[in-house]
Amino acid sequence: SGPLKCVYFDLEHTLNEEWARMLGVNLEENFYLVSPDAQSAEELLDLIVDMVSSEEVGLVVLDSICYLEPMAELNESLEKKSYGGISKLLSSFFRKVTPYLHKFTASLLIINQLRDSMDLYKLYDTPGGRALKHACSVRIMFKKGELYNEKFEAIKKSSELAFGNQVLVKIEKSKISKPDRIVGFYKLSYYSGIEKESELADFMLKFGLITQAGSWFTFIDPESGEILDGFKAQGMPKVVELLKNNPELFNLYTTYINNNMIK
């Protein structure tokens, strides 16, 4: 049977392959990029159903939902177009594709966007209607956080020397974990992608796996609670550097936190 394929529907025609590789995406093996030109929403959604039901595709990414255009709107001029007709179509699509997703343990990842809400009680809403929200097993909101420099220090939003930014993450809906909670954040470097070691250092500090005295950080053995000899750093950048240069240390704390702290 072999490895399952990943199919990425780039409806916005904005996928940056260099940036994708930096984030760890392997574009050379079992990755298929689809950049449709004038296909209707009906054609694209039927294609997704066919792909998932083929048992050869393990992940489909749809980027993004608001660029789907029903056939009736595709053939009309801009003057005659009436928007909002995608919700009913999505309802039918999810009834078709969901059984195949479960049967073949495939995943459908749909990227959406925030829109200003007309509802006085809601600051924002997302395109796709209720059918999309109801069908999803998990809905996650990503939001840009504060900027930081190469020392992982917060800087002003007006700064032109940003090294990266925090990405805030919130679970909007989940059938597999607790909903409506702030999961936390991770750091995104504009030069190297997701800063896994910096994220781990933040978790270690939060859970007491490193202790701070002034500018010095001491590593704690997660099993014994004793000071870990030979690992001490001055400043958070040095902590991150230690984790990058010592894979066994990175794996030790990552495994412990995933198994014992994250619930």
Describe the role of every protein-language-model region.
Residues 73, 116-120, 213-216, 227-228:
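N-terminal cationic and glycine-rich segments that engage phosphates or anionic surfaces
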